[in-house]
């Protein structure tokens, strides 16, 4: 099992860190391919029925998460669309992209905050330290996503990532 997630706010950035018991190249790969992302992206009780990835600078990642857990009350049946536009990719080491809330056509939802995400993949002798830095345009935008439960959602998502990494290494 990997380590616990560490989260903190630094100015307008939400910083998340966690060590995964998997090699860096594998952790990087499961962030770069739709077939992998469909298996683990999103909090528990949510699936990814739609996901496309054009993994290159200027390329787009477009996905839909759907709540399939009846125990999640008003969220059951809800769809949440997202879109990322990749800016910089250093193979095995770094992904920088802008993350948007979107509709099914990939149009940005104007009244929801976007964020510039920098993901760093650090080799730790067969394990990988993943550091995600999400920079928001304002304190209000950051507070909006914190109030939406972003930290819990990412914790559950990264728990699912750990489980997926374990399954593909067997």
Regions inferred by a protein language model and the residue ranges of each:
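Intrinsic-disorder/low-complexity, polar/charged segments enriched in Ser/Thr/Lys/Arg/Asp/Glu/Gln
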Residues: 11-17, 60, 81, 94, ...
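Short beta-edge strand/loop motif at the mouth of beta-sheet-based domains
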Residues: 15, 35-81
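A short, structured loop/turn motif at beta-sheet edges
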Residues: 24, 53-58, 87-94, 120-129
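Short, highly charged C-terminal tails/helix-capping segments
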Residues: 165-170
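Hydrophobic/aromatic beta-strand elements that line small-molecule binding cavities or substrate pockets
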Residues: 18, 50-53, 82-88, 114-122
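Hydrophobic pocket/interface hotspot
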Residues: 27, 37, 61-63, 86, ...
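Hydrophobic ligand-binding cavity/cleft-lining segments
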Residues: 1-48
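Beta-strand/loop substructures that line and gate deep hydrophobic ligand-binding cavities in soluble
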Residues: 98-100, 106-152
